[in-house]
Swiss-Prot record:
This is Uncharacterized J domain-containing protein C2E1P5.03. It is found in: Endoplasmic reticulum membrane. The keyword Membrane applies. Residues 145-303 are cytoplasmic. GO terms for molecular function: Hsp70 protein binding. It is a single-pass membrane protein. It holds the Pfam family DnaJ. One of its GO terms (cellular component) is endomembrane system. The chain crosses the membrane at residues 124-144. Residues 244-303 are annotated as: Disordered. Belongs to the DnaJ family. It comes from Schizosaccharomyces pombe (strain 972 / ATCC 24843). Residues 40-102 form the J domain. The lineage of its organism: Eukaryota, Fungi, Dikarya, Ascomycota, Taphrinomycotina.
Length: 303
């Protein structure tokens, strides 16, 4: 933790402006407030950006005569700034810094210090940046936790193998090892070399292997889980309804099949009664016809 704090402190120191930078910013702001046309140091002296020191001194003599307070009392502030500007351009380091800010842009005064205003990230950019930083930190924590668990597993294996000579008994190819002064009981397989932790109460062995620790995947990180959580809460309902609807249709189909089978059974049970009714009706017709025929013969004989 202390190392991280020191790194952040050094990073903040590197980002801080130097005294020469602050002096350049003050002179630039003062020049803009006086001239109102955002003139550069080179434009004020009327020299090119690659002018030599001799050319700068020559231009300074001309401008100092022009803006001298004795000749022009209103240009007293500009005359003092002219001396500061020439001193900045005469020094190689301060001139490089001025040329750098002239090319990339000068920071603006924001209450307590000079801050860059060329790019102001919006809320979306800030949230994306925070999301990426949190994802990276979460990934690093998962990797550290995985390595720590593997190290713990390896430590158990080393302890069991170091004290293998203290084995009290054996189970076939496995030797039971109890560390002196320790509470854990290990079993070491003399053939495969596997080390297990033995629970004496339940007599269950738990395999100790660094390979059993799952490796860190992208799907385990915050970078994957948060978008998945949002998408699932937003659109998961529609995906969840599809299987339910199919189950409903299946259940409806089963109900229809059951109803059909019931109707078939009912029809099979009801069909004999219909046959019996038709047979009875046929017998009645036969009786009627049989009764009618003798009557007609008797009447013919009498005639």
């Amino acid at each position: 933790m202390s190392r991280i704090f020191i790194l952040l402190l050094l990073f903040g120191v590197c980002l801080a402006w130097t005294s020469s930078d602050l002096e350049i910013f003050r002179v630039v702001d003062s020049l803009k407030s006086i001239l109102k046309n955002k003139a550069t140091f080179y434009e004020l002296l009327e020299v090119p950006t690659k002018a030599s020191i001799k050319e700068i001194n020559r231009a300074y003599r001309k401008k100092s005569i022009l803006y001298h307070p004795d000749k022009n009392p209103k240009s007293k502030e500009l005359y003092t700034l002219l001396g500061l500007i020439v001193n900045i351009l005469r020094n190689t380091e301060t001139r490089k810094r001025y040329d750098y800010f002239l090319k990339n842009g000068f920071p603006r005064w924001k209450g307590t210090g000079y801050l860059y205003s060329r790019y102001r990230p919006g809320l979306g950019a800030v949230l994306v940046l925070l999301f990426l930083l949190i994802s990276i930190a979460h990934f690093v924590m998962l990797v550290i936790s995985s390595k720590r668990q593997k190290k713990i597993m390896q430590d158990h294996i080393d302890i069991a193998r170091q004290h293998e000579s203290y084995a009290t008994s054996a189970r076939g190819s496995k030797r039971i090892v109890q560390v002196p002064g320790g509470r854990r009981i290990y079993t070491v397989d003399s053939i495969t070399g596997q080390v297990c932790i033995l629970d004496p109460s339940s007599n269950i062995e738990y395999l100790v292997s660094p390979d059993s620790v799952a490796s860190v995947k992208i799907s385990d990180t915050f970078f994957y889980r948060l978008p998945r959580f949002i998408v699932w809460n937003a659109f998961g309902r529609w995906f969840a309804r599809a299987p339910a609807s199919s189950e409903d249709t299946d259940s409806d189909g089963q109900m229809e099949d059951e109803e059909k089978s019931d109707s078939v059974h009912k029809s099979s049970f009801s069909s004999p009664s219909k046959k019996e009714a038709s047979i009875k009706a046929g017998k009645r017709r036969m009786k009627r016809r049989a009764n009618r025929i003798p009557l007609s013969k008797n009447t013919n004989r009498e005639n």
